[in-house]
């Protein structure tokens, strides 16, 4: 099934004929298969591991270094993330480079005109399916300074670092704050700990600082989150393993504690698939007596999922907005 963005692109198939093509940005479907027959070659790059892991021909990472005669960028909901990815890629190509930018109007794709105008000619060439399609030709190669995109803030004795689109990138969010408040030195936490959906590494860094002897693994699907966690740990001289994983897809070991402030937003829609998988599979990923501890908006339907997977659960902290759930294997 094609996304709305790709449906618009199918109206312009002649543009892809006999050219090397790169699809990158928020690619979520198999539009690549639609153009392989007529294009010279098709490459796909994604910063999202949940998508990239499904297909052998999709490259995953933070920096896209793939060149092509025509690039197609799928706009994401986060303007700064788009700016980072577009300027990073354009900084390494030549004047005259052609690019198409496609995105939903509600995701703010219109702002691409102001973003790319200083670097070349940009024009809207189609409007359909509540999306805008733009053609861009590079006239002035931009300088890309990745350092300018970093945000940081202080959390007690920790320095937290985050790239665009990483959750809780500017300050500690209320849910994570409530979750962290349920840990204290008296817990004597030890063994293997997994911070799943680690974002900027806030939870993992806080636990590692309090409980030095834990063996910590942090995972996320977003390349920007993984890089953010790595930097947070490096800047605070903490030890931890950072892995790209779609829930447990790339994690084989068992843990004594799995802790998470799980995402329930996918792009600009709400999605529960990752959280459902986390709760359903967590018991099999815990050692005997191990614990799953998660925080969530109070209105989300997690109690039933926890009871189905574990038999029972406890609410160990709550605020007006959030609840912290604990379930034991």
From Swiss-Prot:
Pfam families: MTS, MTS_N
Compartment list: Cytoplasm
GO CC terms of this entry: cytoplasm
GO molecular-function terms, A-Z: 16S rRNA (guanine(1207)-N(2))-methyltransferase activity; nucleic acid binding
Record keywords, A-Z: Cytoplasm, Methyltransferase, rRNA processing, S-adenosyl-L-methionine, Transferase
Superkingdom of the organism of origin: Bacteria
Principal subcellular localisation of the protein: cytoplasm
InterPro entries from the UniProt entry: DNA_methylase_N6_adenine_CS, Mtase_sm_N, rRNA_ssu_MeTfrase_C, RsmC/RlmG, SAM-dependent_MTases_sf, Small_mtfrase_dom
Top enzyme class: transferase
Annotated EC: 2.1.1.172
Catalytic reaction list: guanosine(1207) in 16S rRNA + S-adenosyl-L-methionine = N(2)-methylguanosine(1207) in 16S rRNA + S-adenosyl-L-homocysteine + H(+)
HAMAP family assigned: 16SrRNA_methyltr_C
Family that this chain belongs to: Belongs to the methyltransferase superfamily. RsmC family.
Assembly, per entry: Monomer.
Function, in words: Specifically methylates the guanine in position 1207 of 16S rRNA in the 30S particle.
Xref: NCBIfam families: PRK09489.1
PANTHER family: RIBOSOMAL RNA SMALL SUBUNIT METHYLTRANSFERASE C (PTHR47816:SF4)
Protein's name according to its UniProt entry: Ribosomal RNA small subunit methyltransferase C
Organism: Actinobacillus pleuropneumoniae serotype 5b (strain L20)
């Amino acid at each position: 099934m094609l996304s709305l963005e790709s449906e618009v692109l199918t109206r312009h198939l002649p543009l892809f004929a006999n050219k090397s093509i790169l699809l990158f940005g928020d690619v979520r479907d198999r539009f690549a298969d639609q153009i392989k027959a007529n294009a010279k070659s098709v490459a796909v790059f994604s910063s999202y591991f949940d998508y990239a892991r499904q297909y052998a021909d999709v490259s995953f990472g933070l920096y896209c270094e793939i060149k092509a005669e025509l690039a197609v960028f799928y706009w994401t909901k986060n303007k700064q993330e788009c700016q980072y990815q577009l300027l990073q890629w354009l900084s390494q190509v030549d004047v005259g480079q052609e690019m198409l930018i496609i995105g939903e109007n509600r995701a703010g794709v219109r702002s691409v005109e102001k973003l790319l105008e200083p670097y070349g000619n940009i024009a809207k060439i189609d409007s359909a399916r509540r999306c805008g399609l733009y053609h861009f030709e590079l006239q002035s190669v931009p300088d890309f300074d990745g350092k300018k995109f970093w945000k940081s803030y202080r959390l007690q004795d920790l320095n937290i670092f985050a790239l665009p689109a990483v959750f809780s990138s500017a300050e500690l969010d209320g849910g994570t704050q409530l979750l962290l408040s349920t840990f204290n030195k008296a817990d004597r936490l030890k063994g293997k700990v997994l911070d799943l959906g680690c974002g900027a590494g806030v939870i993992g860094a806080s636990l590692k600082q309090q409980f030095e002897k834990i063996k910590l693994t942090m995972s996320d699907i977003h390349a920007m989150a993984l890089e953010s966690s790595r930097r947070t740990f490096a800047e605070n001289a903490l030890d931890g393993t950072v892995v790209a994983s779609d829930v447990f897809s790339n994690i084989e070991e068992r843990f004594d504690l799995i802790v998470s402030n799980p995402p329930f937003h996918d792009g600009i829609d709400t999605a529960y698939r990752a959280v459902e998988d986390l709760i359903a599979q967590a018991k099999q990923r815990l050692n005997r007596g191990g614990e799953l501890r998660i925080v969530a908006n109070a209105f989300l339907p997690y109690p039933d999922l926890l009871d189905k997977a574990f038999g029972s659960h406890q609410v160990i902290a709550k605020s007006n907005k959030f609840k912290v759930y604990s379930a034991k294997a």
